[in-house]
Amino acid sequence: MSACRVKPFLSVYLLVALLCVSLTSTAQSRYPQGLEQVGQARFSLLWLDIYDARLFSADGSYRPGEAPLLLELTYHRAISSRELVDETLNQLEGRFERAAVPGELNDLLPSVDDGDQLAFYLRADGAGAFYFNGKYLGELDDSDFNRAFLDIWLAPDSEYPELTRRLKGKE
């Protein structure tokens, strides 16, 4: 094959490869669809409603270690990004080594207002994506961190066992 014929072929090949990568990343950044609700719960401290939580899975049931899972939190009050990150780090204490928490977490947890929704989607491959009001924020590929993050709400020894039971559809 002459050099003149190879260049157009390589250009077309590169264009197709880039298009495939672009479509894959676009598909992964779309808000998850087709999941069934497992359970829901309201999280309150004293008399303050903080958020409503809903958990979704492929078939509407929760089985530890299985994915995909989608956790949606709809907030009832304003909370700064810094407060969300700090509380997340506090809740991860004992579940995940603080030094190993991905630095991107600071960029992925936005400030929220009353009515805002923050969602975390754990894919079957262990990657986790964050969404804010349905808009893709970014993802973390650390499957150990992603599981520990969901365990804040789903672990048998979570700080709020009633919330955990309801999210798992047990009440």
Feature roles, as predicted:
Residues 2-13:
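Bacterial N-terminal signal peptides that target proteins for export
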